[in-house]
């Protein structure tokens, strides 16, 4: 089981060993499956970012991500980042999580997925704020197999 917060900041290496950038964010598709990684690559005016499709990631280790070639890096305008973990138009981080009875469980602090098998989200780490995290710790909400019982709202 891997978490998104661990991936952010990791170097992205090409197969030849050169560094292509660092992971800045993770992009999701319309079904909230991991679809791409957003690179923090030095661009002067920052109107565009580089992204790599998750299918082009050759290896996802504890210390780095490896992609096959520079050709898999694609430049996209920053305003086209729709669903991401922390920097897009719709951010998964800090979204509130409610039960079907309307009780708030907390806010999303991290996301868990199975790295080698697939890109489906398998759980969330929830926070109630800094003091609650310090005194009580964060809670994990591990999803049952499949995402039938989970619905993500607009806000």
Task: Give the location of each predicted region.
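Peripheral interaction segments used for macromolecular assembly
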Residues: 1-155
């Amino acid at each position: 089981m891997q978490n998104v917060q661990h991936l952010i900041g990791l170097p992205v290496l090409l197969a030849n060993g050169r560094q292509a950038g660092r992971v800045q964010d993770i992009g999701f598709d319309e079904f909230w499956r991991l679809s791409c990684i957003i690179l923090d690559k030095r661009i002067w005016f920052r109107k565009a970012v580089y992204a790599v499709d998750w299918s082009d990631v050759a290896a996802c280790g504890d210390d780095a991500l490896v992609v096959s070639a520079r050709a898999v890096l694609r430049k996209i305008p920053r305003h086209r980042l729709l669903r991401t973990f922390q920097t897009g138009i719709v951010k998964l981080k800090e979204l509130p999580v409610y039960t079907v009875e309307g009780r708030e469980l907390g806010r999303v602090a991290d996301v868990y997925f199975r790295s080698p098998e697939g890109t489906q989200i398998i759980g969330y780490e929830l926070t109630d704020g800094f003091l609650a995290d310090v005194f009580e710790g964060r809670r994990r909400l591990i999803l049952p197999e499949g995402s039938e019982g989970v619905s993500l709202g607009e806000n």
